[in-house]
């Protein structure tokens, strides 16, 4: 295996028994691919596929004028360049988007020609601006109004047909009623349902129900056609004074004979006997094809067609009429009588449709359509045209109804049709087949569907949702255009006069800005970003609501396997509604989730990988990834555990169709980061997955000693690290930028040979954590494409590192770890292991007020020198200033209205000309509880307002940075070109005969080499072209600089009424302290109870104290044993690191070092490492990085076994039990039994006590009830609730209770009086009537009951 530059520096010992068949796919591909399809930016306008924006336009256009004299057609669209890049958009608080321009064609027809044959009179084409479309950043997010947002993928009910039942809950009898529902992508829902009398009804859009025959009549079927469609028939004729029935063998089986069936005199089947297959055979052998039936047999049978007396033309009986005794008499009198009855039995052919027809009062197509019109639009008078138009538009009009290709595929597959394609609207046959299938289910011939299977729920990603939002906007435009098209010709209008872009841009803005699925990105650490982008929500528009979702929808379903993670979902009301994609899952063209499997043929496992959706999976037999195989990949066991039809079975190895590609296939990214996940209880694993997302990036990231091997993938795919775009050599590397000279073969035509990576320094994330990048390469390193050049937040050498490795002991310590509390050593604080940086953004706006503009200035009235000492002459704080609560960051004064002056003030004014009292101090101050360093200031000034000195200085700084980048690029290009021409020139001759040598070139200025007069013409022209290239490049780079300069020097687009905006960023250092929440990766969370001096902590025989003491009682009841295994393996990892460290200290021989590494990596189970492929220097560097511990990877469901952990503990000369003697730091005595000690990866979560501590004296009150507000954000109080009142009542503390409910709460006068009394030093209170009592009185009066308070 070849290792990249960063991988060589630190190789993980991997315990996986199987090498990976399939690499983990790019984790953000779902988001990025979806949006790429929506825009189709890289395709030429006329070659675009009918998806995304193109599809939205094609479905709305062309728009036809009402009068038919003009059409507006869509031709194509183009996307412009965004005005600002992502970084500038975040700074300025604008949306990262690019303008959408659409080419429209207005076609005018000749008015005077007859309709339908109108010749084209004129065609006008024009590009129309249709608003800005937000663009996706490199990392799958959107910048909307300066903040990064994620559009969460939705899981919604797939269009198609679903058969279900009410599980016997609808009717009091408990009878199970079946129903069918045809769900389109957009349009009216069509429901069919049985009632308790076994009649079939139809509902449109969940309105009032109608008999199902009405919809067939409306589609043009007569009663007889309806009966023909749904029933089999039996022919009966009247001959020689008897009724003769034709026998149909298929109708006889299983029936009970109502009379003797005989061949001549020989009785074959006796009356009352059940007819068997043998009886039918006997009848066929005897060639009995008809039988005389007694008259009473016909009583109660139903006619399938009407009976007419041919002689008189009289209608004797209608179709669907029940045969009664008087009808039989009439029938006997008809000559040559022959008729059909419906074949109905109690087994498999119910009379449901026949019974339903009896309820139907309509007799013709028009009546049925009018009935439907009345139901859809009650109160409106129906006409023939309107009712016909409404019915056709409901299901048969492409503009109103769209089944979509998914819906058509699902419908056809469910109805057992061969073809998956077809019309995108409903057809008559579809409705008939759905009702037939519903009848089959009622007759017990078919089964209902499972609604919660992933075969009936599909994924709607960003692109599709944006397309729908866009289509909504276009439909709004369409209405306006239709009306304007009439006057298009008379007024000589152009396409842009017809189209108003506002509705479209409003729809897009609304979707990206305030849709339920457009969420503020969770950016605590790289994992939370990745997980947020891979989230799948069942909520949102067109989805479920929390209140209505039952248990079934939320539950884990067998089809989740490999598609949706069964572990990672939030606790609380959203449990099961918000899920996360499994690590290998992807969507197919229909939007259903698929998971990869290896193909298995006759027990031989192949390398071929196929993606299978939940719809197809049930029919296959699928083995686990852990099934035993020999070296030739043949399944060893005769019987293999497998999954088939959503059940786990034991199957013969010959019957296996597929096999999982990886053991971690079933879990999500976060869950696959938990080592020994297989030993944890699911509830705790859920908490572990969720808490990893809340881990705050520490000052120095520390890779986990025990990981799972997927850390690298997450760090790289999250986009927080810097990845080499092309291979090459590092020219320079410092904390702010890395410059790479690209390899010659990787430079494409017209590209520069230089890559400059500007690193992000101390930027604020959405959650106020710190985003900072640090280089991990040095000048002279040779890198390849895809190598990690710089670490981001929470990454260490290109691996995800969200916590710290802590030495942990599982033991109680003086009660300080009661109930999951955590005892932490002071050393952890001293070493800043959990110190985190949080960045607060504080904004100051200078507005134009009625009394004049506000002004940012350092001249603030009534403020001392000390308070202004940190401000520059513009009134803005210096970068680097240490500030604390209440300090001024931006000085600002606001004009205040003229007030009546006292005589003294008038005198002072007259003497000193004092105007200071005209303004009040509205400076931006440091908010409560914030103390830190100012790390950045940005000043934005409105166009036309003069920039202050500070703004100009910031602008100058920015320009210098850009200039430096551009100069560096040019310098490297120039050096490269000169390096290339030097060998060409040496040995050549000048025109005057001088030979060019290395010394000659050294004596010349290298920039003059191009102008050398060489004798060789070809070389001369080559030199000339190279010089031209350089000059052109220089001009291009200068153009880039001028563009940037223009952006920086122009005014900023601020919100209305704001003339200046100053943003100040304050970095706050938070050390760990009691009250902070910490957790491991196994759901083992707790709160720090005490920071204990190092000397008091328990220590081992070598005198090494532990860092953290955890309560051993936190393990058994929670069943998360993974943490114990992690602790043991962590101990081995650290012990091996200590041995390597000792070898390096003693400068051991490189062979000895290699052999020890070989023992660690290659003599236990897992993936082998070839140390011979590394140079000695690389081995030394690797060993140097392993001093603090050998990092291990224990992949989920394929991790280290107990024996392997023991073997590594032995190798590290540590006790195999993982337990050791500890001594009490306070008394020095040995504890009475060995204690489990080891290394666990521990995280500090974003629930810091500093953000939660809060106390109120007086503060804001609620408007209506006048009670104090609640919550820290409102500076609220603690609620004294119902139960607390009971407690005081129980104690009989009457006066305390009285003050709680009156003066401390909502007795207005009482509380002001008391406050005044306390100020006066008079501690006396007189309670009055609480305001909430008055509110109650008012509410009672609102009910019309007068209530008065009478004074006694």
Swiss-Prot record:
Q: What class of enzyme is it?
A: transferase
A GO molecular function annotation here is: DNA-directed RNA polymerase activity
Q: Which GO terms describe its cellular component?
A: DNA-directed RNA polymerase complex
Pfam families listed in its UniProt record = RNA_pol_Rpb2_1 (PF04563), RNA_pol_Rpb2_2 (PF04561), RNA_pol_Rpb2_3 (PF04565), RNA_pol_Rpb2_45 (PF10385), RNA_pol_Rpb2_6 (PF00562), RNA_pol_Rpb2_7 (PF04560)
Q: Which UniProt keywords apply?
A: DNA-directed RNA polymerase, Nucleotidyltransferase, Transcription, Transferase
Any one GO biological process: DNA-templated transcription
Q: What Enzyme Commission number(s) does the record list for this chain?
A: 2.7.7.6
Q: Which reaction does it catalyse?
A: RNA(n) + a ribonucleoside 5'-triphosphate = RNA(n+1) + diphosphate
- Oligomeric form and interacting partners: The RNAP catalytic core consists of 2 alpha, 1 beta, 1 beta' and 1 omega subunit. When a sigma factor is associated with the core the holoenzyme is formed, which can initiate transcription.
Q: Could you tell me what this protein does?
A: DNA-dependent RNA polymerase catalyzes the transcription of DNA into RNA using the four ribonucleoside triphosphates as substrates.
The family note in this entry says:
Belongs to the RNA polymerase beta chain family.
Q: Which NCBIfam families match?
A: PRK00405.1, rpoB
Name of protein: DNA-directed RNA polymerase subunit beta
Source organism: Hydrogenovibrio crunogenus (strain DSM 25203 / XCL-2)
Its lineage opens with: Bacteria, Pseudomonadati, Pseudomonadota, Gammaproteobacteria, Thiotrichales
């Amino acid at each position: 295996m070849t290792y990249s530059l960063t991988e060589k520096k630190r190789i993980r010992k991997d315990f996986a028994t199987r090498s990976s068949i399939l690499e983990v796919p790019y984790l953000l591909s779902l988001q990025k691919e979806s949006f790429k399809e929506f825009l189709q930016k890289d395709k030429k306008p006329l070659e675009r596929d009918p998806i995304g924006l193109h599809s939205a336009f094609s479905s709305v256009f062309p728009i036809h004028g009402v009068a038919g004299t003009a059409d507006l057609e869509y031709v194509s669209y183009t996307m412009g360049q965004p005005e600002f890049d992502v970084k500038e958009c975040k700074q300025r608080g604008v949306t990262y988007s690019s303008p959408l321009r659409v080419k429209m064609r207005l076609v005018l027809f000749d008015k005077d020609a007859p309709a339908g044959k109108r010749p084209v009179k004129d065609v006008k084409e024009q590009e129309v601006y249709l608003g800005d479309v937000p663009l996706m950043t490199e990392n799958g997010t959107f910048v909307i109004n300066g903040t990064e947002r994620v559009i969460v993928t939705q899981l919604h009910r797939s269009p198609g047909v679903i058969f279900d039942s009410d599980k016997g809950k609808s009717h009091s009898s408990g009878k199970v009623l079946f129903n069918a529902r045809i769900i389109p992508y957009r349009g009216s829902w069509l429901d069919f349902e049985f009632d308790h009398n076994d009649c079939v009804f139809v509902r449109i859009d969940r309105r009032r129900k109608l008999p199902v025959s009405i919809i067939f009549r409306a589609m043009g079927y007569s009663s007889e056609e309806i009966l023909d469609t749904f029933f089999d028939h039996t022919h009966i004729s009247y001959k020689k004074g008897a009724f003769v029935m034709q026998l149909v063998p298929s109708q006889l089986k299983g029936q009970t004979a109502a009379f003797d069936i005989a061949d001549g005199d020989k009785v074959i089947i006796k009356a009352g006997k059940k007819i068997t297959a043998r009886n039918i055979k006997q009848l066929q052998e005897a060639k009995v094809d008809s039988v005389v039936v007694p008259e009473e047999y016909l009583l109660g049978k139903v006619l399938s067609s009407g009976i007419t007396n041919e002689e008189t033309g009289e209608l004797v009986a209608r179709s669907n009429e029940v045969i009664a005794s008087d009808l039989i008499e009439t029938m006997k009198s008809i000559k040559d009588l022959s008729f059909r009855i419906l074949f109905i039995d109690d087994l498999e052919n119910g009379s449901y449709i026949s019974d339903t027809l009896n309820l139907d009062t309509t007799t013709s197509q028009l009546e049925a359509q009018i009935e439907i019109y009345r139901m859809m639009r009650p109160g409106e008078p129906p006409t023939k045209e309107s009712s016909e138009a409404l019915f056709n538009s409901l299901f048969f009009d492409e503009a109103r109804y769209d089944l979509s290709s998914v819906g058509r595929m699902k419908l056809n597959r469910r109805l057992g049709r061969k073809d998956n394609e077809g019309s995108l609207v409903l057809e008559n046959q579809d409705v008939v087949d759905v009702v037939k299938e519903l009848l089959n289910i009622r007759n017990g011939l078919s089964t209902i569907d499972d609604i919660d299977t992933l075969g009936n729920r599909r994924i709607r990603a960003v692109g599709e949702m944006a397309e729908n939002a866009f289509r909504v906007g276009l439909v709004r435009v369409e209405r306006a255009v239709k009306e304007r098209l009439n006057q298009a010709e008379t007024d000589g209008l152009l396409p842009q006069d017809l189209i108003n872009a506002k509705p479209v841009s409003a729809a897009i803005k609304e979707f990206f800005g305030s849709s339920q699925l457009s969420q503020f990105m969770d950016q605590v650490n790289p994992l939370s970003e990745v997980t947020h982008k891979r989230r799948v929500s069942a909520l949102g528009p067109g989805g479920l609501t929390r209140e209505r979702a039952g248990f079934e929808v939320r539950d884990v379903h067998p089809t989740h396997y490999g598609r949706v993670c069964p572990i990672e979902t939030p606790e609380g009301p959203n449990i099961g509604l918000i899920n996360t994609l499994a690590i290998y899952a992807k969507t197919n063209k229909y939007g259903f989730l698929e998971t990869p499997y290896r193909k298995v043929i006759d027990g031989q496992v192949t390398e071929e990988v196929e993606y299978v959706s939940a719809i197809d999976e049930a029919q296959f037999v699928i083995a686990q990834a852990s099934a035993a195989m020999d070296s030739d990949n043949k399944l060893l066991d005769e019987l293999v555990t497998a999954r088939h039809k959503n059940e786990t079975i034991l199957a013969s190895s010959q019957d296996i169709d597929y096999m999982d590609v990886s053991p971690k296939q079933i879990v999500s990214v976060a869950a696959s980061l938990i080592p020994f996940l297989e030993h944890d209880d699911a509830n705790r694993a859920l908490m572990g997955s969720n808490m990893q997302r809340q881990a705050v990036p520490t000052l120095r990231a520390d890779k986990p000693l025990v990981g799972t091997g997927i850390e690298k993938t997450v760090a790289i795919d999250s986009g927080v690290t810097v990845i080499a775009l092309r291979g090459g050599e590092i020219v320079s590397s410092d904390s702010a930028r890395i410059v790479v000279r690209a390899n010659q073969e990787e430079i494409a035509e017209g590209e520069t040979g230089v890559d400059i990576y500007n690193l992000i320094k101390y930027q604020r994330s959405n959650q106020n954590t710190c985003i900072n990048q640090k280089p991990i390469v040095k000048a002279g390193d040779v890198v390849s494409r895809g190598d990690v050049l710089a670490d981001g937040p929470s990454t260490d050498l290109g691996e995800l590192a969200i916590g710290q490795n802590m030495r942990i002991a599982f033991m109680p310590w003086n009660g300080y770890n009661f109930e999951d509390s955590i005892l932490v050593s002071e050393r952890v604080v001293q070493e800043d292991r959990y110190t985190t940086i949080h960045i607060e953004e504080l904004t100051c706006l200078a507005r134009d007020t009625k009394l004049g503009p506000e002004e940012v200035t350092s001249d603030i009235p009534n403020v001392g020198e000390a308070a202004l000492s940190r401000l520059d002459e513009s009134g803005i704080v210096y970068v680097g200033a240490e500030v604390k609560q209440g300090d001024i960051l931006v000085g600002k004064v606001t004009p205040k209205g003229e007030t009546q002056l006292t005589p003294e003030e008038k005198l002072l004014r007259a003497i000193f000309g004092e105007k200071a009292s005209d303004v009040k101090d509205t400076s931006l101050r440091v908010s409560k509880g914030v103390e830190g360093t100012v790390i950045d200031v940005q000043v934005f000034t409105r166009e036309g307002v003069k920039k202050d000195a500070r703004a100009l200085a910031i602008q100058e700084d920015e320009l210098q940075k850009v200039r430096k980048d551009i100069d560096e690029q040019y310098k490297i290009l120039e050096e490269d070109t000169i390096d290339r021409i030097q060998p060409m020139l040496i040995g050549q001759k000048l025109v005057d005969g001088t030979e060019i040598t290395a010394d000659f070139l050294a004596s010349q200025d290298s920039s003059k080499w191009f102008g050398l007069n060489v004798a060789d013409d070809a070389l001369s022209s080559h030199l000339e072209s190279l010089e031209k290239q350089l000059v052109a490049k220089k001009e291009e780079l200068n153009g880039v600089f001028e563009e940037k300069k223009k952006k920086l020097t122009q005014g900023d687009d601020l919100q209305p009424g704001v003339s200046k905006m100053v943003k100040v960023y304050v970095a706050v250092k938070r050390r760990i302290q009691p009250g902070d929440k910490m957790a491991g990766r196994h759901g083992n969370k707790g709160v720090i109870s005490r920071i204990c001096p190092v000397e008091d902590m328990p220590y081992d025989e070598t005198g090494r104290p532990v860092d953290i003491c955890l309560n051993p009682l936190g393990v058994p009841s929670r069943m998360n044993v993974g943490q114990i295994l992690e602790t043991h393996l962590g101990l081995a990892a650290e012990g091996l690191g200590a041995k390597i460290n000792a070898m390096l200290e003693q400068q051991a021989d490189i062979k000895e070092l290699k052999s020890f590494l070989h023992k660690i990596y290659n003599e236990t189970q897992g993936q082998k490492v070839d140390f011979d492929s590394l140079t000695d220097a690389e081995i030394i560097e690797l060993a140097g990085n392993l001093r603090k511990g050998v990092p291990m990877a224990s992949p989920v469901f394929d991790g280290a076994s107990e024996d392997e952990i023991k073997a590594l503990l032995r190798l590290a000369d540590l006790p195999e039990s993982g337990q050791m003697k500890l001594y009490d730091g306070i008394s020095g005595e040995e504890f009475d039994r060995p204690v489990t000690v080891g290394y666990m990866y521990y995280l500090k979560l974003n629930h810091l006590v500093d953000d939660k501590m809060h106390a109120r004296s007086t503060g804001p009150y609620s408007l209506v009830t006048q009670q104090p507000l609640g919550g820290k954000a409102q500076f609220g109080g603690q609620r004294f609730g119902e139960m607390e009142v009971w407690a005081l009542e129980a104690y009989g503390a009457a006066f305390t209770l009285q003050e709680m409910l009156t003066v401390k709460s909502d007795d207005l006068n009482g509380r002001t009086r008391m406050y005044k009394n306390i100020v006066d030093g008079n501690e006396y209170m007189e309670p009055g009537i609480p305001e909430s009592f008055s509110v109650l009185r008012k509410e009672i009066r609102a009910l019309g009951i007068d209530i008065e308070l009478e004074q006694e």
